[in-house]
From Swiss-Prot:
Subcellular localization, as worded in the UniProt entry: Membrane
Keyword Membrane on entry: yes
Name of the protein in its database record: Potassium transporter 22
Gene: HAK22
Residue ranges annotated as Extracellular topological domain: 86-98, 220-236, 286-318, 367-385, 459-469, 514-519
Length: 790
């Protein structure tokens, strides 16, 4: 049991701690309670983000997840052979040896970024099973106070504490560990003490989020359009407009099936992708044997140097097409919540890599003989007897490729919303077994509409490819920067390896970025415009959220004011329990006096409830609630913080109230059992009383009898309190929701007025309301409105 004075004097904090409290003497000779506890949040933090599901995972489950990986993760990477060569050589092949250079670029880019960076490094930088840029941001938030919302609590410090490495090391190892810890502490201090650095980190995170969402719109457009384009070979009468509208029809069906969930879609699509990979791998082997097996020389990286030496600036520009070979790698990371590391590595190494590399090598062998067919390299290199099966599988696999990025967008938005960086939308958990599998109806509708608009407007895979490339490489570059911070702050890797990682990946990704930005006017503006809008939405929402929180925090109601309000003669105590929802995690919100002034009555038991998301995936239900009692105790006013991880789903109102009241009764019991002992400050050794306040001069029998009497009285007292709370709950529960209207101050700048009064107001009116997010029954809902000038 831990007891302390909370913010806003007169509040007593008792967290649901160990059942065996111990005592310690402070430096002033005072007896205090000591808490020794390691809860599930502590254990999550001490893992440093290591998602080791495979350690306790059976092979049957691993193989089943590996099978689903094909249907969810690999569609985008697996369908890249449809358009990589045509986009890279959009001006034609100048020299047949250029094919060796491009194939070598594809091989080593694929190995470097997809295998080394994502499959073997980034997947291990997950946040206890969650991947993506926001998961990296939350992982950093657990090790440094980088959040812009000032709602951290001392209890969170305990839960998010990082266990120190054992001091029982060899001297040389200990010196290295000490240096790494000093370096990590320096980075931690920089992140916590520099507001510009924290803002920059946040902006990079939401930029990556915006790019991922934009990519979820562009991937379906380019994948399906490139697959449908193969119809022109067998149906020359089809024009571009007809191909575009066929693509739109397929896109509509794709987004319509998203509501069935990733779990079902994965089982449905996995056989399709497996057949597709077997087909393109087999066709690749055929082309190597039939045309030019010598292209396998491209595994020698010297052909990359020869390619750039021969083509110069043109070779640099062509990198915008080469990078399309590793599109979809971010989905491997962001969709990790649905799968395990071992299942991804297994299916990737033995299924995806051989098939895709054989497909690229086979096309290169074919184009060495028929370079004029580069505009339709994939279908032209496919044997005619396999054309129709290939076309059907290409269409199906393109749909699957789109599924990977759509799932990635859903997961990313779910994380960002939980961290207060995205407007409130409905998140549907589509699987009871895997909480990372979600579906967001509003986002699905917007993504589907945007994909159709881009397809109709662009009408060409080359234009969409340029836009697609910017999304891919920007997200990868931001991931590299965040991974570098994780290596220093969380993993505490040797600085040499950190520099190698940062230099190699940041430099190569920057070269790719400059290449795609060169063609900004030829389609690159599409994701930039979409991301700018999305960043604006997230930035406005988060900015006003932070400002509103600070406004309420600066105007918390004092203890004297609370006593005055609840002691009014005209104030009536209504039977039942009232749950007053507020964003504040400490203190009484300013809307409470407003409620008393308008409606001079409150419930017999009143709890100020804050729903708070911690930067961890899950919070154990037994550790969900923190309570404080607002003094004086006879008024039955409590503060409650309900803590969730960003992947936890909120319970419905009935279950939430039942769990809250149960924990509140435990809290009342603990206050009665330990509260008095914790408040006793015993001067040792001059005190005439022991730690229980019993005179030392009393005989042993008298002391024992007095202890028993007090124990019986305390048990009887807390039993009465528990029964009282239970009776009040049975009389009814009312949910009181503070609806604050936020406006800019009259003398604010024009920009601030536009952001707060118009942009934020529009978002707030059109997103889901708080009562729907909290699943509050309308028959038990009371809304209290108040205007804030920020």
């Amino acid at each position: 049991m831990a007891q302390q004075q909370g913010q806003g004097a007169g509040t007593t904090t008792v967290a649901m701690m160990s059942r065996n409290p111990s005592y310690y003497y402070s430096g002033e000779g005072e007896l205090s309670l000591a808490v020794q506890r390691q809860d599930s949040l502590y254990r999550d933090a001490s893992r440093a983000g290591q998602h080791e599901q495979a350690h306790g995972e059976g092979w049957a489950r691993t193989l089943r997840l590996a099978f689903q990986c094909f249907g969810v993760l690999y569609g985008d990477i697996g369908t890249s052979p449809l358009y990589v060569y045509s986009t890279t050589f959009d001006g034609g092949i100048r020299h047949t040896d250029d094919l060796l250079g491009v194939l070598s670029l594809i091989i080593y880019s694929f190995l470097l970024f997809t295998i080394i960076k994502y499959v073997y490094i980034a997947l291990r930088a997950n946040d206890d099973g969650d991947g993506g840029t926001f998961a990296l941001y939350s992982l950093i938030s657990r090790h440094a106070k980088v959040s812009l919302v000032p709602n951290q609590q001392a209890e969170d410090e305990l839960h998010l504490h990082i266990s120190k490495s054992s001091s029982l090391r060899r001297p040389s190892v200990q010196r290295l560990a000490s240096t790494a810890e000093e370096r990590a502490q320096w980075v931690k201090d920089l992140l916590e003490n520099s507001r510009p650095v924290r803002i920059s980190l946040f902006l990079l995170t939401i930029l990556a989020t915006a790019m991922v969402i934009s990519d979820a719109c562009l991937t379906p457009a380019i994948s399906v359009l490139s697959a449908v384009g193969g119809l022109k070979d067998k149906a020359p009468h089809l024009n571009t407009e007809q191909v575009v509208w066929v693509t739109v029809g397929i896109l509509v069906m794709l987004f319509a099936v998203q509501r069935f969930g990733t779990d079902k879609v994965g089982y449905l699509f996995a056989p399709v992708v497996l057949l597709w990979l077997l087909l393109i791998g087999g066709v690749g082997v055929y082309n190597l044997a039939a045309h030019d097996v010598g292209v396998l020389r491209a595994f020698n990286p010297k052909y990359i140097l020869d390619y750039f030496r021969r083509n110069g600036r043109h070779g640099w520009v062509s990198l915008g097409g080469v990078l399309l070979c590793f599109t979809g790698t971010e989905a491997l990371f962001a969709d990790l919540g649905c799968f395990s590391i071992r299942s991804i590595q297994l299916s990737f190494a033995f299924g995806l890599v051989p098939a895709v590399l054989l497909a690229y090598a086979g096309q290169a062998a074919y184009l060495r003989v028929y370079p004029d067919h580069v505009g339709d390299a994939f279908y032209a290199s496919t044997p005619q007897v396999l054309f129709w099966p290939t076309l059907v599988l290409a269409l199906a696999a393109s749909v699957v490729g789109s599924q990977a990025m759509i799932s990635c967008a859903f997961a990313t938005i779910s994380h960002s919303q939980a961290m207060g960086c995205f407007p409130r939308v409905k998140v549907v958990h589509t699987s009871r077994q895997y909480q990372g599998q979600v579906y967001i109806p509003e986002i699905n509708l917007l993504l589907g509409a945007a994909a159709c608009v881009v397809t109709v407007a662009a009408r060409d895979t080359v234009v969409i490819g340029e836009a697609h490339g910017i999304c891919v490489v920007l997200v990868m570059l931001i991931t590299t920067l965040l991974l570098t911070v994780v290596m220093v702050l969380v993993w505490r890797v040797n600085i040499g390896w950190v520099l190698v990682f940062a230099c190699v990946f940041a430099s190569t990704e920057s070269v790719y970025l400059t290449s795609v930005l060169y063609k900004f006017a030829h389609g690159g503006y599409i994701p930039v415009a979409m991301s700018a809008v999305l960043m604006g939405v997230m930035g406005v929402w988060h900015y006003v959220h932070v400002r509103r929180y600070k406004y309420e925090m600066e105007r918390t109601v004092s203890t004297e004011r609370v006593r005055e309000l609840v002691s009014r003669r005209e104030l009536q105590r209504v039977p039942g329990v009232g749950l007053f929802y507020t964003d504040l995690v400490q203190g009484i919100p300013p809307v409470f006096p407003h409620l008393i002034d308008k409606i001079p009555s409150i419930h017999t038991v009143l709890l100020f409830v804050s729903v708070k998301h911690l930067p961890v995936p899950h919070v154990d239900p037994s550790e969900r609630f923190l309570f404080r009692q607002v003094e004086p105790q006879e008024h039955k006013l409590f503060r409650c913080v309900a803590r969730y991880g960003y992947r936890d789903r909120l319970e419905d109102a009935r279950d939430f109230v039942a769990n809250l009241v149960e924990r509140l009764q435990y809290y009342v019991r603990d206050v009665n059992l330990y509260g008095a002992a914790a408040n006793n400050k015993v001067s040792y050794p001059s005190s005439r009383c022991d730690s229980m306040g019993i005179p030392k001069s009393a005989s042993y029998a008298e002391r024992l009898q007095l202890q028993r009497a007090r124990s019986v009285a305390m048990l009887h007292s807390h039993s009465q309190h528990q029964r009282f709370i239970q009776r009040e709950m049975e009389k009814g529960v009312v949910f009181i929701l503070g609806e604050s209207e936020v406006v800019a101050r009259p003398h604010s700048s024009l920009l601030k007025k536009l952001v707060v009064n118009y942009a934020y107001s529009f978002l707030r009116r059109n997103c889901r309301q708080g009562d729907k997010m909290l699943a509050i029954p309308r028959s038990q809902l009371l809304k209290v409105g108040m205007s804030y000038e920020i």
